[in-house]
Regions:
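Membrane-embedded alpha-helical bundles that constitute the cytochrome b-like, heme-associated redox core
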Residues: 1-237
Length: 237
């Protein structure tokens, strides 16, 4: 079995073998990020659309205060995990690093993107198999998750700095975000819209993981538990 060094496309003409794609630190990072994103989305939605009633006076129950506290904690945890992975703290094979730095200048890679799109649009009967993420998945993760994380992190940290006050170190570090966007009222909707981008990304990610596991030629769900990607012999004929 041969693996293309640029796209990681698998040539299974000579048989297949398991490929170790996700190291243990990457798998742990993946599930911790999932927990952080879930907490951010739930509490972020409640911040954007607060509950209209509660079981007592707000100064006694402190419900919204707890929601904000969980949101801030999850956001800071998410930020720490993102920075940790971005700078290689979680290690990872070349497959795990690729969606952070996809080969955007490679025509071979872009052909793989369009081939995958054609497959999902039922314009071709099959698509190549890849040791890591396919090129379209890499592009989606880079655009929606990596770039989206940059936006949601800087806007989130700016809004968090605002809660501390204008004469604080937090504002000294992140006050430039308000200057960049114009004011706080411009930052807030951008941050909120990114929540919906993350929701769409999560739904697509989960759906495609199940779909590829069932219809594709390689395991997807189990690989994030074991680290191994197995290829189906019958799928390759």
């Amino acid at each position: 079995m041969k693996i293309d060094p640029v796209t990681f496309e698998v040539d299974a003409s000579g048989g297949t073998r398991p490929v170790y794609v996700w190291e243990a630190p990457v798998r742990v990072w993946h599930w911790l990020m999932a927990v952080a994103m879930f907490a951010m989305i739930i509490t972020g939605y409640l911040i954007g659309r607060p509950l209209v009633s509660n079981l007592g006076d707000t100064w006694i129950t402190y419900d919204f205060g707890y929601v904000r506290m969980v949101h801030f904690a999850a956001g800071l945890f998410f930020t720490a995990l993102f920075i940790y992975r971005l700078f290689g703290g979680a290690g990872g094979t070349r497959y795990g690093r690729m969606f952070f730095f996809p080969p955007l200048l490679s025509m071979k890679w872009w052909k793989g993107v369009f081939a995958q799109v054609a497959y999902y649009l039922f314009m071709r009967k099959s698509a190549p198999e890849y040791a890591g993420h396919n090129p379209l998945a890499q592009l989606a993760m880079f655009a929606m998750f990596v770039l989206g994380s940059f936006v949601i992190i800087i806007t989130g940290l700016a809004l968090y700095a605002q809660s501390w006050g204008w004469d604080t170190s937090w504002m000294a570090w992140f006050g430039w975000v308000f200057v960049l966007f114009g004011d706080a009222q411009a930052v807030r909707p951008v941050h909120h819209v990114m929540m919906y981008v993350f929701i769409l990304f999560s739904i697509a990610h989960i759906y495609m993981s199940f779909r590829e596991d069932v219809m594709g030629g390689a395991t997807t769900l189990s690989s994030m538990s074991t680290g191994l990607r197995m290829f189906k012999e019958d799928h390759h004929g």
